[in-house]
Amino acid sequence: KTFEELNHNDDVKVIILTGEGEKAFSAGADIEYMSKISADESVEYAKTGQLVTATVELVKQPTIAAVNGFALGGGCELAMSCDIRIAADTARLGQPEVTIGVPPGWGGTQRLMRIVGIAKAKELVYTGKMIKADEAKEIGLVNHVVPLASLHEEALKMAQQIAANSTMGVQMSKVAINKGRNADLDTGLGLEILAWRNCFTHPDRQERMTAFVNKSKK
């Protein structure tokens, strides 16, 4: 519900997600609950989790995951739903679901391979291993690794840098990238043209271009 409200709030330019305290970014799924449900009930549970991650992924504002601790299972899937991931040097990430008898169910099998590639995704999912922040950065799972003490400051700094740009330009870029990710090149280029055109109908584009031209003439 919060993200649905944010999606309609034009005053919010960037969203930062982080966990409370220093221990975990997100605890992920409720394993005790999962141990008691039927196969049919598990489908609904997985669909609910996928709806949550899809809602985060599709919100119009750019999203930054400030991964402050453990991001395992559903927590890692939530982080992967964000556009940018900044991890504390103490963070640990992974998809350990196979250790309890199931594959990732909240989008992990699909988003992980799109972020780090199929081979590395298979390794992480099949082994269920937990990796440190530095390795996560090395394979492209997170964008940056920073000291825990400066995590929020660094996330805010990036958010401010994004927010200083054209809101429409950034949001249309997000649409083009997200929709083009699974398309062939020609379709993706068509999506880019649509995003480009949409920005040309917005007054902010004219104001920014005029200001740039006037500044260049001085």
Regions found by a protein language model. Give the residues of each.
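C-terminal long alpha-helix characteristic of the crotonase
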Residues: K1-E5, I86-A91, V142-G190, P203, ...
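A structural preference for short, pocket-lining loop segments at secondary-structure junctions
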Residues: K1-I37, T55-A65, I84, A88-R92, ...
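Short, active-site-adjacent cap segments at secondary-structure transitions
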Residues: E22-S26, A71-G73, I177
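A short acidic, glycine-rich active-site loop
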Residues: K36-K47
